[in-house]
Amino acid sequence: MKKTYRVKREKDFQAIFKDGKSTANRKFVIYHLNRGQDHFRVGISVGKKIGNAVTRNAVKRKIRHVIMALGHQLKSEDFVVIARKGVESLEYQELQQNLHHVLKLAQLLEKGFESEEKH
């Protein structure tokens, strides 16, 4: 994922948490904030309660892969994806479905893409 598509600075994370809206399902929480940019930016957070470092990094890679696959469908907003406990045991397909579901709930998918079948 290119650096321009990442939320990296603590200040940006805090602004999204403070001023953004949140949406959740059983496996993910998403905070999002529209800042008027021309593309989306994403930050991924996987807490220490979820496995060891290897497991957390694997979860982050899977989330990043799903986000990039959905990239053309995402609205131009900043958002932070927080993984909840239990996400580490999901297969890729289940993780993709859960993430797609919470993005749809947060209305972060462009019109016309929400009704598309999941891969």
Swiss-Prot record:
Its EC number is 3.1.26.5. PROSITE patterns: RIBONUCLEASE_P. It catalyses: Endonucleolytic cleavage of RNA, removing 5'-extranucleotides from tRNA precursor. It comes from the Bacteria. It is an enzyme of class 3 (hydrolase). One of its GO terms (cellular component) is ribonuclease P complex. GO terms for molecular function: 3'-tRNA processing endoribonuclease activity; ribonuclease P activity; tRNA binding. GO terms for biological process: tRNA 5'-leader removal. Keywords: Endonuclease, Hydrolase, Nuclease, RNA-binding, tRNA processing. The keyword Nuclease applies. InterPro entries: Ribosomal_Su5_D2-typ_SF (IPR020568), Ribsml_uS5_D2-typ_fold_subgr (IPR014721), RNase_P (IPR000100), RNase_P_CS (IPR020539). Consists of a catalytic RNA component (M1 or rnpB) and a protein subunit. NCBIfam families: rnpA. HAMAP family: RNase_P. Belongs to the RnpA family. RNaseP catalyzes the removal of the 5'-leader sequence from pre-tRNA to produce the mature 5'-terminus. It can also cleave other RNA substrates such as 4.5S RNA. The protein component plays an auxiliary but essential role in vivo by binding to the 5'-leader sequence and broadening the substrate specificity of the ribozyme. This is Ribonuclease P protein component.
